[in-house]
């Protein structure tokens, strides 16, 4: 099983790749590659969140299922994800089996917004965990002070 860090790293790579191929839009290959990799980036972020909330993510590419699992765990997801989750899932499967996809620039832009919001949410979660650990360390070290 991949770790939270692994999912974050892989999501960032997918996002970087989709941004890079945007330079070649409207080339069909560039569009399909970007759609596939933005889906992969969001999928991996959702899986990282599921791990952060203490569960193992399901082995699926279905964004709707992964988002539902996150919500069941109490994760507040970007509202715009509801608008594009089916499209993202379709983009992932279409890239593998269908040479032509229905591309929506508006939905692609929304997917990038979702990526950015999830990235911020994951970073905030990890930073709060670091602060909690620092507070625990401080509390424990206070108990080790010599008394006179």
Locate each region found by the language model:
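Terminal alpha-helical segments
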Residues: 1-148
């Amino acid at each position: 099983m991949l770790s939270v860090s692994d999912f974050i790293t892989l999501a960032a790579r997918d996002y970087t790749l989709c941004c890079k191929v945007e330079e070649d839009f409207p080339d069909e290959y560039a569009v399909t590659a970007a759609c596939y990799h933005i889906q992969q980036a969001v999928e991996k972020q959702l899986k990282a969140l599921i791990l952060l909330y203490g569960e193992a993510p399901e082995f699926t590419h279905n964004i709707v299922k992964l988002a539902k699992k996150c919500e069941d765990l109490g994760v507040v997801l970007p509202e715009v994800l509801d608008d594009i989750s089916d499209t993202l899932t379709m983009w992932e499967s279409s890239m593998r089996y269908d040479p032509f996809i229905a591309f929506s620039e508006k939905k692609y832009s929304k997917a990038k917004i979702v990526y950015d919001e999830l990235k911020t949410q994951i970073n905030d979660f990890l930073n709060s965990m670091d602060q909690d650990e620092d507070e625990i360390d401080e509390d424990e070290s206070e108990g080790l002070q010599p008394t006179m």
